[in-house]
Amino acid sequence: MFRAQATTPYDTAIAKATDENLTSEDWGAIMEVCDRVAGDDNGAKEAVQALIRRLAHRNANVQLYTLEVANALSQNCGKPMHRELASRAFTEALLKLANERNTHNQVKAKILEGTKEWSDMFKDDADLGIMYDAYYRLKQTNPQLQPPSAPQKNSLTDVDRQKEEEELQIALKLSLQEEERKKQQTPAGPSGAAGPSSSSAPDQAGTPSGQGADAGAGAAAVPLQPTGTGTTAATVSRVRALYDFVPSEDGELEFKKGDVIAVLESVYKDWWRGSLKGKTGIFPLNYVEKLADPTPDELQREAQMEAEVFSEIKNVEKLLTLLSTSSKDEDSEEIAKLYQQTSAIRPKLIKLIEKYSQKKDDFTQLNEKFIKARRDYEALLETSMSHPPQPSYHQYAVRPQGYGGSPTPYPTQGPPQQDPQRFYPPGPHPDQYPPSSPSPHLQRPGGTPGPGAQAPFYVAGAEVPSHGGPHPNQNFPPRDPGQRIPSAGKQPARLQTQQASSSPPPSAPYAAYSQPPAQQGSYGNPQELSTSAYDSPVASHPHPNPLGSNAPFAPATYPAEERYGTPSAAPAPLNPGGGQQQPYQYNSYQNQTPPQPANTQPPQGGMYSGQGYNDSSDAVGNVPPQPTSAAPPPPVPGSQRVHSPVYGGPPGAADSRFSLPSRMGPGAPSAPLGGPSSPGEQPQYKAYVPPGSSGPSAPSAPSVPADYYRQPGGTANY
């Protein structure tokens, strides 16, 4: 009488893919079904028949999984499956399930979504139009299943913004009142603890005992009622999606039904901006419902439920242990009891899974934002450190003249100077002639100064000349490192300096200080500084040092007798007024013909202005004026003079005073009078003695008529 329902080879595979105990789609089983149907000519027809039988199941999960399998078959099995899905049998089964009163709303929404998608897929084939007819009929009979159309993006008006601001102020006021109410209940103790633990606001409003409450407590209880009544983004923090939303423009947020979206701000009149799973965009308000913030009672109940679920963890672990150790055929009452207890917490466990899954997504999103912000900061920091700001040099172009009209630090570059007198040609090191000052025991030749003259004074090793009457003219030409022959006609012994082994460069090192007339030799016939105007012949080649390289040098400024010798005559008084006299001995000049003044320009300053050549000027005590007359030719042409070294000075340094005629004897001995007997001792020099004289004479001796400085013509320069 009754025929058994026919079965197909695909019933088992589809039943496995749509098991009611599944918590999510089993895509492995679904793809296995698709592979079998694609490889079988009758697979599409038999698979659709198995799907129709699974749609008749009373479990909503089975119905949802069956619709998902049908969607997978339509996308993977081609044209034969499209014809079977658009058949009259399958479409009638869908409409029947959607129109039943006991069908779950999610199943109805899934059927509507599937028929719409298949209608769009089959619209190019006229033979498959039955699917579009089924979709149209389902939409007419169940208008509530169709998601609403997205509203227009209208800009917010001033009224809307004012309303949002008012709701924000109300929410802030309610929050402050709630905080005040909590502060008032805190010191009340156990007697006032019934207020926060009471059930709900409507129950409190209907309680007659509220008449005895004070006005402050009644006012504090009022804010509990309007909670969650906000309608703007300023007062709503979360919304739940009612439908699936697929973005149609850039900047819109995609979400599925049931997703909870965090509200950020209002963008348009019916569009808000929200954040979901790390993405931000706008969404329509008619696709979501507002969620009120949980009340303290709700939070307490949620915490209690969570504690109950975690308390069952021991039973779950015990059940798993018994199931893994006991045999399959053995029935145990303990296992059945534990299974019932653990099954009771399944709905609560699902809610907790959803809750913590959402929290996990929120924390993951926050972590991604933090990592991105940190990377941006590190990138900016590296960029700023790898490209430091360049200094602006223009701000140093002009500096104030801090020291009396000194030139600016960055003068304009011009053509090089062509005047050779302004440059130092290559020659001896500048330190060859260090500055020197006269000895404190030095006395000026000429005896007592005149009534109009002032005695010189000495400051820190340098002499400051006195300013008295006019000074006589003297000529101070640049010196020459060559030798000269004294009037006796005998060449003195040559002394070696530290640069005796190498000749000076051919360029004139003294050309920067004078412009003499036609000169002979390498250094231009310099004039002797300690005489009035005396030309010196120039040696055309360097002379070796007869004393050896280890011979000691004379002092830089003072002769040997000034440091080590004993004065041979009483010195003349330094000033007419009398005072402390300092001994000093100098050698007289005899049998010297006074030379004529030379027409040679004196040095204009430089490295010789304060060095060995200033001894003659120091003898006067004042800076001598510049001579204008021409110098006579040298008395003995071709003669050479000794280049006296400077003791303790740099290489090549020489003292000009030791090359004067007064410092050399007539026979030019290799070692001066009183000098050392060995090269290691300090040399001493004797005074000049003319031929026929028995010994040196003091400058003040009146018995020397041939003394140059005692002659009437010879004292004119002093």
UniProtKB/Swiss-Prot annotation:
Belongs to the STAM family. Pfam families: GAT, SH3_1, VHS. One of its GO terms (molecular function) is ubiquitin binding. Keywords: Endosome, Membrane, Protein transport, SH3 domain, Transport. One of its GO terms (cellular component) is endosome membrane. Residues 234-293 form the SH3 domain. It is a peripheral membrane protein. Residues 17-146 form the VHS domain. Component of the ESCRT-0 complex which is the sorting receptor for ubiquitinated cargo proteins at the multivesicular body (MVB). The keyword Membrane applies. Residues 408-438, 624-637 have a biased composition (Pro residues). This is Class E vacuolar protein-sorting machinery protein HSE1. Its main location: membrane. The keyword Lipid metabolism does not apply. Residues 521-534 have a biased composition (Polar residues). Residues 187-202, 210-221, 509-520, 581-604, 665-680, 689-706 have a biased composition (Low complexity). It comes from Pyricularia oryzae (strain 70-15 / ATCC MYA-4617 / FGSC 8958) (Rice blast fungus). SMART domains: SH3, VHS. Component of the ESCRT-0 complex composed of HSE1 and VPS27. InterPro entries: ENTH_VHS, GAT_dom, SH3-like_dom_sf, SH3_domain, STAM, UIM_dom, VHS_dom. Residues 163-182 form the UIM domain. Coiled coil: none annotated. It is found in: Endosome membrane.
